[in-house]
Every structure is written in structure tokens, then in C-alpha cells.
């Protein structure tokens, strides 16, 4: 069972969202709760890395699963709490994608903080997903459209 679920419809193809997700160094552009993120290897299952949060905490993470252009899941440990973040998308049309981010909270002391963390994560993840949506839509507008060519105008 997920503790937090947020979702949005993005007016962008999945490829734009995937480019954003898979570039961990750019995570602060859309996830404003992080100051810096890095992976110590390629964007694939098993790769470890870390994010430094705005409050200065280091959050080690591991990519648990990566399904190209569909989803990825990472685990993280923050103090004595285990977090699992799931990022999924489903193409609705050529230029529209359903994106879902969810989080699970676990660990020996998670029951003490679950309510507070659930509220904080809901706010943070909603903001992050809104920012991701805006960024993907801006990039999609600037990206060349394949299969479509401009129609030249002739002055009469």
C-alpha cells in the first residue's frame, strides 16, 4: 500500500518526461526539495547515488527498478525511515501522458513519523509533479515535432 499518491496529465510525450527523470543532476529543476542529486553510474537498476535535501540532509538512494520510457523505482533512507518512490507514466496520446508518483514509508520507527511524513511528502511530491509537468510541457513545445513539417506561407 502506498502512503502517498500524486498524479497529473502532462501535455508532453513520454520521451520528454523520461529525459527529465533520467537526468538526476537536473532533479532540482523540478524537485525543489532537493539541492543536488547524483547517481554513481548509469540510470539502471542497482545504481546507487544520493540527493542532498534543501535542509542539508544527505539521502542515499538506490535505483531498484528501471523500465525504459515507462517507470522507475528508487529506495532511500532518511534518518531511520525507509522510503520507496515509484515513478510511472502511461502514454494517453501522441502529446499527452499520465504521470503518477507514489511513496511508501517503512522502517522500524516509521510508525512514529508516518502521519507527519505523509503530509510533508504529499505537499513536496505535488509541487515536484507540478514542476515536472511545466518543465516537460515547455521542453515539448521547444522540441521538433517528428512527422510534421511546416507549411510555407506565400504572400499574395
Please place each PLM-identified region on the residue numbering:
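Glycine-centered tight beta-turn/hairpin loop motif at sheet-sheet or coil-to-beta transitions
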Residues: 1, 54-56, 80-82
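Hydrophobic ligand-binding cavity/cleft-lining segments
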Residues: 1-38, 153-156
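Intrinsic-disorder/low-complexity, polar/charged segments enriched in Ser/Thr/Lys/Arg/Asp/Glu/Gln
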Residues: 3-7, 48, 58, 71, ...
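Hydrophobic/aromatic beta-strand elements that line small-molecule binding cavities or substrate pockets
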Residues: 8, 59-65, 84-91
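Short, hydrophobic/aromatic-rich segments at coil-to-beta transitions
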Residues: 43-50, 67-74
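Beta-strand/loop substructures that line and gate deep hydrophobic ligand-binding cavities in soluble
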Residues: 77-127, 134, 143-147
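Charge-rich (especially acidic), low-complexity segments
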Residues: 144-156
